[in-house]
Amino acid sequence: TVKAQDVALKTNLLGWATTSLNAGVEIGTAEKQTVQLFATINPWKFSGDKKVRFWNVEPEYRWWTCQRFGGSFFGLHALAGEYNIKNVDLPFGLLPKTKRGRHYEGWYIGAGVTYGYQWLMSRHWNMEASLGVGYAYSPYKLYGRCARCLDKNHRNYVGPTKAALSMIYIF
């Protein structure tokens, strides 16, 4: 049965800073173990013909060094999603630089390792910082004006796969 300190709801404040809607749930599975499922979506089109639309799901297993929902943890995460990006250059070489009027559509799947720390703020509220690095495979299509496909290619990405500063409510 699920008891107190076994379930947490969370949101990544860094995601909100980029206008990305996001939420996650984390469930205690043992004294020092939790599993988390996190989802993010950004459905917006911005001014100046810029677009960064995507969705992402990220399951993660966590092992806590002391007790769950407090202190340091190490994790293994997976990630998968789709994107549609126009007139925006992404950091870390995620995609080749875009020229005006061109956009990328594709999907990705990957995995990585995480380190994080969770601070106890009050009986029900915590704050968490985490960073993950890993690998992602991403096939994509590059489109030009009038939706003409200019290129089909893929990226093998190695680098940061996760960054979070999360506000957490623990039941």
Question: Which residues does each PLM region occupy?
Answer:
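Boundary of Sec targeting at the N-terminus
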Residues: 4-5
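Short strand-turn segments of transmembrane beta-barrel domains in outer membranes
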Residues: 9-16
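Short hydrophobic/aromatic segments of transmembrane alpha-helices and their interfaces
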Residues: 16-17, 110, 159
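Short, surface-exposed coil-to-beta transition loops
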Residues: 19-22
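Gram-negative (and chloroplast) outer-membrane scaffold detector with strong preference
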Residues: 27-129, 164-169
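Predominantly the C-terminal beta-signal and adjacent terminal strand-loop region
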Residues: 122-171
